[in-house]
């Protein structure tokens, strides 16, 4: 196993995750099997209970792990599936070590950061890397490890010490360190290297040396700037990689390839360069022949909360040669005029009461005005509530989560008595059986599918017959549980309890999103 560790300096938010995912993609394009690990130095066990407005999207993995959004980038760029083992947090590491100490596993030793915490980190990285198998049964040859945060952060210190030990243990040929740093421009447009020099100095103080430096900038990095960084930071000039901001993140692997990243990295890892597979580049470089505008009705004002939805729309749009322009509409602030200008409406997932009535009003507008609609998770539940109120006749229909009224949406039976909120929802992959005559079955090309879930509530079985008698059909089920719905007399009114966006890939767009984008495009053509 060979390891590529990606660290960051100067400031957070530079795009380490996209850089790590892009490195994985160019290595796959050279014929290698690659997996990824993300280290998040926070004390939370996982991302499940973190405020999405602060942390961004909670990405759900196939085994039910609730992870950082970078795991979603890895899955999309590398076209792989990961598990909760591939997301390490300080909370997981310390919890495991303390549990082992209580169990007596350390045989009376004084438990310390070094060696016990660092050994736990290394063991978990190694386990995640070596246990991963792709859909064809291939084991990974290279593991990309992204260390969250910035070099110098106190939270990252045990992880960086573990990385230092890994470098010593594996040595050149099996280990490479890629450091992502900021190259800010002054008022004259010249890129400044001093922050990078200080960042490399901080890295050295921890016993680490960068093998490759990736300079993030809105401008191209000149050869003279690369030479300056090379001279001050002791890396080969060819190992100073320009990472100029790209108009589309899926173009980043192409830009890194042009900069020679793959050749430098493979040389460091003592691997053959191999022939580049250009399939990825043809996949992401398609031309658009049409354009649609989709409104996403949001509870949270941060686009990163909905990154998988945004990417799934992009995947479907590319597949259909249709550019998807997204209008982000606050559920509490939008107007009917905002909805009238859209080609389609998407209601995403979320929790809590805020913005719910605005989402329900948008669903009613889409139903009555025959505007394509896709509802996801909470969006699915709100479609049921809107229909119960305005068609079935229960004016006080609501969710048990929201308060008093007719509970069209009820708590899952297995959630009764659950006290801990973390990791206790219905999470991860579950099978869904589709009605063979449904639109979704046609889109999936199958009646038995698997999708990812994240919810505590479901359609109340008491009202299913009444709802279906009025024309809303539940076309996807898991046993007695309702998983998907459609309206027959509508161009595209589809909602799912599951999250199809989490399994969407550039090469394999999500079926509900394909249907949604296609319906939006047809609606626009008719206008």
Curated annotation (Swiss-Prot):
<dbReference type="InterPro" id="IPR004468">
    <property type="entry name" value="CTP_synthase"/>
</dbReference>
<feature type="binding site">
    <location>
        <begin position="153"/>
        <end position="155"/>
    </location>
    <ligand>
        <name>CTP</name>
    </ligand>
</feature>
<dbReference type="InterPro" id="IPR017456">
    <property type="entry name" value="CTP_synthase_N"/>
</dbReference>
<keyword id="KW-0460">Magnesium</keyword>
<keyword id="KW-0315">Glutamine amidotransferase</keyword>
<feature type="region of interest" description="Amidoligase domain">
    <location>
        <begin position="1"/>
        <end position="271"/>
    </location>
</feature>
<dbReference type="GO" id="GO:0019856">
    <property type="term" value="P:pyrimidine nucleobase biosynthetic process"/>
</dbReference>
<feature type="binding site">
    <location>
        <position position="228"/>
    </location>
    <ligand>
        <name>CTP</name>
    </ligand>
</feature>
<comment type="pathway">
    <text>Pyrimidine metabolism; CTP biosynthesis via de novo pathway; CTP from UDP: step 2/2.</text>
</comment>
<feature type="binding site">
    <location>
        <position position="228"/>
    </location>
    <ligand>
        <name>UTP</name>
    </ligand>
</feature>
<dbReference type="Pfam" id="PF00117">
    <property type="entry name" value="GATase"/>
</dbReference>
<dbReference type="InterPro" id="IPR027417">
    <property type="entry name" value="P-loop_NTPase"/>
</dbReference>
<feature type="active site">
    <location>
        <position position="499"/>
    </location>
</feature>
<dbReference type="GO" id="GO:0004359">
    <property type="term" value="F:glutaminase activity"/>
</dbReference>
<feature type="binding site">
    <location>
        <position position="146"/>
    </location>
    <ligand>
        <name>Mg(2+)</name>
    </ligand>
</feature>
<keyword id="KW-0436">Ligase</keyword>
<dbReference type="Pfam" id="PF06418">
    <property type="entry name" value="CTP_synth_N"/>
</dbReference>
<feature type="binding site">
    <location>
        <position position="456"/>
    </location>
    <ligand>
        <name>L-glutamine</name>
    </ligand>
</feature>
<dbReference type="InterPro" id="IPR017926">
    <property type="entry name" value="GATASE"/>
</dbReference>
<keyword id="KW-0547">Nucleotide-binding</keyword>
<protein>
    <recommendedName>
        <fullName>CTP synthase</fullName>
        <ecNumber>6.3.4.2</ecNumber>
    </recommendedName>
</protein>
<feature type="binding site">
    <location>
        <begin position="192"/>
        <end position="197"/>
    </location>
    <ligand>
        <name>CTP</name>
    </ligand>
</feature>
<feature type="binding site">
    <location>
        <position position="350"/>
    </location>
    <ligand>
        <name>L-glutamine</name>
    </ligand>
</feature>
<feature type="binding site">
    <location>
        <position position="70"/>
    </location>
    <ligand>
        <name>Mg(2+)</name>
    </ligand>
</feature>
<comment type="function">
    <text>Catalyzes the ATP-dependent amination of UTP to CTP with either L-glutamine or ammonia as the source of nitrogen. Regulates intracellular CTP levels through interactions with the four ribonucleotide triphosphates.</text>
</comment>
<dbReference type="GO" id="GO:0003883">
    <property type="term" value="F:CTP synthase activity"/>
</dbReference>
<keyword id="KW-0665">Pyrimidine biosynthesis</keyword>
<dbReference type="InterPro" id="IPR033828">
    <property type="entry name" value="GATase1_CTP_Synthase"/>
</dbReference>
<dbReference type="GO" id="GO:0046872">
    <property type="term" value="F:metal ion binding"/>
</dbReference>
<dbReference type="GO" id="GO:0005524">
    <property type="term" value="F:ATP binding"/>
</dbReference>
<feature type="domain" description="Glutamine amidotransferase type-1">
    <location>
        <begin position="294"/>
        <end position="526"/>
    </location>
</feature>
<feature type="binding site">
    <location>
        <position position="12"/>
    </location>
    <ligand>
        <name>UTP</name>
    </ligand>
</feature>
<feature type="binding site">
    <location>
        <begin position="378"/>
        <end position="381"/>
    </location>
    <ligand>
        <name>L-glutamine</name>
    </ligand>
</feature>
<dbReference type="GO" id="GO:0044210">
    <property type="term" value="P:'de novo' CTP biosynthetic process"/>
</dbReference>
<feature type="active site" description="Nucleophile; for glutamine hydrolysis">
    <location>
        <position position="377"/>
    </location>
</feature>
<feature type="binding site">
    <location>
        <begin position="192"/>
        <end position="197"/>
    </location>
    <ligand>
        <name>UTP</name>
    </ligand>
</feature>
<feature type="binding site">
    <location>
        <position position="70"/>
    </location>
    <ligand>
        <name>ATP</name>
    </ligand>
</feature>
<keyword id="KW-0479">Metal-binding</keyword>
<keyword id="KW-0067">ATP-binding</keyword>
<dbReference type="GO" id="GO:0042802">
    <property type="term" value="F:identical protein binding"/>
</dbReference>
<feature type="binding site">
    <location>
        <position position="401"/>
    </location>
    <ligand>
        <name>L-glutamine</name>
    </ligand>
</feature>
<feature type="binding site">
    <location>
        <begin position="13"/>
        <end position="18"/>
    </location>
    <ligand>
        <name>ATP</name>
    </ligand>
</feature>
């Amino acid at each position: 196993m060979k390891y590529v560790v990606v660290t960051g300096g100067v400031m957070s938010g530079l795009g380490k995750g996209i850089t790590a995912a892009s490195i994985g993609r160019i290595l796959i394009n050279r014929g290698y099997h690659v997996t990824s690990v993300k280290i998040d130095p926070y004390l939370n066990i996982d991302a499940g209970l973190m405020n999405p407005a602060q942390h961004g999207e909670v990405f759900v993995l196939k085994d039910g792990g609730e992870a950082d959004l970078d795991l979603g980038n890895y899955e999309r760029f590398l076209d792989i599936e990961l598990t909760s083992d591939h997301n390490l947090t300080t909370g997981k590491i310390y919890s495991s070590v303390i549990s082992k100490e209580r169990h007596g596993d350390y045989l009376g030793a004084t438990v310390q950061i070094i060696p016990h915490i660092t050994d736990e980190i290394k063991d978990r990285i190694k386990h995640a890397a070596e246990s991963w198998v792709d859909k064809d049964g291939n084991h990974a040859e290279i593991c990309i490890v992204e260390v969250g945060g910035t070099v110098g952060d106190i939270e990252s210190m045990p992880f960086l010490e573990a990385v230092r030990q890994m470098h010593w243990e594996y040595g050149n040929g099996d280990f490479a360190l890629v450091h992502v740093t900021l190259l800010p421009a002054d008022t004259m447009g010249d890129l400044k290297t001093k922050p990078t020099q200080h960042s490399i100095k901080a890295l050295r103080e921890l016993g680490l040396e960068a093998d490759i430096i990736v300079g993030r900038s809105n401008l191209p990095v000149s050869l003279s700037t690369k030479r300056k960084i090379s001279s001050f930071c002791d890396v080969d000039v060819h190992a100073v990689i320009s990472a100029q901001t790209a108009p589309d993140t899926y173009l980043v692997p192409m830009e890194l390839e042009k900069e020679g990243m793959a050749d430098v990295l493979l040389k460091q890892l003592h691997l053959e360069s191999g022939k580049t597979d250009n399939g990825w580049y043809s996949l992401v470089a398609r031309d658009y022949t049409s354009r649609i505008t989709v409104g996403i009705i949001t509870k949270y004002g941060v686009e990163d909360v909905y990154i998988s939805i945004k990417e799934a729309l992009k995947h479907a749009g590319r597949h259909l040669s249709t550019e998807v322009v997204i209008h982000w509409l606050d559920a509490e602030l939008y107007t009917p005029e905002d909805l009238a200008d859209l080609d389609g409406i998407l209601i995403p997932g979320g929790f809590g009461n805020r913005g719910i009535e605005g989402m329900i009003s948008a669903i009613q507008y889409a139903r009555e005005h025959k505007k394509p609609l896709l509802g996801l998770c909470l969006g699915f539940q709100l479609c049921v509530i809107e229909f119960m109120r305005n068609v079935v006749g229960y004016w006080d229909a609501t969710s048990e989560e929201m308060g008093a009224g007719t509970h069209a949406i009820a708590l899952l039976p297995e959630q009764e008595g659950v006290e801990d909120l973390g990791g206790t929802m219905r999470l991860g992959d579950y099978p869904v059986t589709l009605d063979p005559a449904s639109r979704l079955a046609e889109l999936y090309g199958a009646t038995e599918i698997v999708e990812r879930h994240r919810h505590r509530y479901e359609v109340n079985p008491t009202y299913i017959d009444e709802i279906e008698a009025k024309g809303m059909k539940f076309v996807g089920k898991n046993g007695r549980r309702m998983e998907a719905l459609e309206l027959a007399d509508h161009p595209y009114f589809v909602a799912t309890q599951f999250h199809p966006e989490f399994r969407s890939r550039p090469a394999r767009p999500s079926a509900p999103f394909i249907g949604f984008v296609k319906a939006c495009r047809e609606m626009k053509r008719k206008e």
